């Protein structure tokens, strides 16, 4: 039986969402770790002259052993097929992100621009995750990420699996409009010009409760070595790994690149940490405090057991679809949504997760009463004006 107790769920949501998964890369499972160095460890671009003061942030858990799949995946081979139309090759690149993965996250502050700023230590974490194709329609693909993690205790015993919904990414071809983050917990829907839309795919990223996080437009490029999509400059709200340790800036401004390879995929971020005025504009007197690089590596697994994640996904899928549709309707009707604060920081998504847990435990379909619960939860977040 997998672990869905409230305490376990709350711990994993706090630790893993929205940006990372509460652990160090020392647990890179199924591969032998090198001996501990005698001198303080060094991290690329991480201010090595400061010695041990910039050791990585993150957690300290270790994961159960896994086996990496070193063979080219079927999705990669399908992506390489000759004679595909450009849009179809793009679609296959997006679908190639589905599967089972060991995920490692690295975020590194490489430059500081404020005289009083001190560089943060690198942030490193890990997780095991299954990415599901939730929808595959003409010009639209939706991918849902579910975490299923087994931890090693101090005696080397493997825990029962922890399961939680993580994030969702939607991909739409030549969209009519985009919902953009504007700072201070506000998102606005903006129509797109033909020049922005033509041949482009919009990626929209959603948080654990289906609330918006960020969206951007970009175009896929393909080669025999990899397929890659690069976003335009995008505003993003601060993730937990940042707002939990600092308050000297308000928005991440940067690019997001997805690169598909034979054995998995990589997500790269190049972010400026930007200061906003009370009017949600970049503060020209001190616009940026630092720059960071981010890297998430999704390494495909072989013979991985994600039965608990499958169970959760199948039983709660219709409920989370209702939540997603309610968010979409709010933006269609209002155009702008300003929340009362970060939903993960305030714990405003708790009623939604509690209801999803009930649905999973009882094996019942989402009911009519859920529409009221969802609207009430979104209302408490500040969705409705």
Q: What are the functions of these language-model segments?
A:
Residues 119-121, 125-135, 144, 253-260, ...:
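Hydrophobic/aromatic beta-strand elements that line small-molecule binding cavities or substrate pockets
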Residues 230-277, 288:
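Extended serine/threonine-enriched, polar tracts that run as long, contiguous segments within proteins
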Residues 30-96, 109-114, 119-121, 139-142, ...:
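Amphipathic/hydrophobic helical signal segments and adjacent flexible N-terminal regions
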Residues 1-11:
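N-terminal secretory signal peptides that target proteins for export/translocation
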Residues 193-253:
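Short helix-loop boundary/capping segments
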Residues 95-99, 133-139, 257-265, 300-305:
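A short, structured loop/turn motif at beta-sheet edges
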Residues 14-24:
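Bacterial N-terminal signal peptides
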Residues 133-181:
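Extended amphipathic alpha-helical segments with heptad-repeat/coiled-coil character used for oligomerization
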């Amino acid at each position: 039986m997998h672990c869905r107790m409230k305490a376990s769920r709350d711990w994993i949501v706090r630790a893993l969402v929205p940006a990372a998964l509460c652990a160090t890369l020392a647990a890179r499972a199924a591969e032998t770790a090198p001996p501990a160095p005698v001198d303080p460890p060094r991290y690329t671009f991480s201010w090595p002259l400061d010695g041990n003061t910039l050791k990585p942030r993150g957690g300290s858990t270790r994961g159960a052993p896994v086996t990496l799949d070193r063979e080219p995946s079927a999705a990669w081979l399908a992506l390489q097929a000759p004679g595909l139309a450009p849009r179809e090759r793009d679609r296959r690149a997006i679908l190639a992100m589905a599967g089972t993965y060991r995920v490692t996250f690295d975020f590194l502050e490489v430059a500081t621009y404020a005289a009083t700023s001190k560089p943060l230590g690198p942030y490193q974490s890990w997780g095991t995750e299954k990415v599901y194709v939730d929808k595959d329609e003409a010009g639209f693909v939706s991918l849902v990420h579910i975490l299923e993690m087994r931890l090693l205790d101090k005696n080397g015993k493997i825990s029962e699996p922890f399961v939680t919904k993580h994030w969702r990414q939607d991909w739409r071809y030549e969209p009519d409009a985009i919902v953009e983050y504007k700072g201070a917990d506000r998102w606005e829907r903006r129509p797109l010009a033909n020049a922005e839309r033509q041949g482009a795919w919009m990626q929209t990223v959603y948080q654990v409760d289906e609330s918006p996080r960020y969206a951007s437009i970009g175009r896929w490029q393909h080669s025999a070595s990899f397929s890659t999509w690069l976003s335009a400059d995008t505003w993003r709200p601060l993730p937990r790994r940042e707002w939990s340790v600092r308050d000297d800036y308000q928005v991440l401004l940067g690019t997001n690149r997805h690169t598909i390879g034979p054995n998995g995929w990589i997500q790269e971020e190049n972010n400026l940490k930007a200061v906003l005025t009370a009017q949600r504009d970049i503060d020209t007197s001190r616009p940026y405090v630092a720059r960071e690089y981010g890297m998430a590596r999704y390494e495909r697994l072989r013979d991985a057991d994600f039965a608990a994640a499958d169970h959760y996904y199948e039983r709660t899928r219709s409920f989370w679809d209702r939540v997603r549709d309610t968010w979409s309707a709010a933006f269609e009707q209002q155009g702008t949504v300003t929340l009362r604060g970060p939903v993960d920081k305030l714990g405003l998504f708790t009623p939604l997760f509690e209801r999803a847990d009930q649905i999973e435990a009882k094996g019942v379909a989402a009911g009519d009463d859920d529409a009221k619960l969802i609207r009430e939860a979104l209302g408490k977040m500040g969705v409705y004006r």
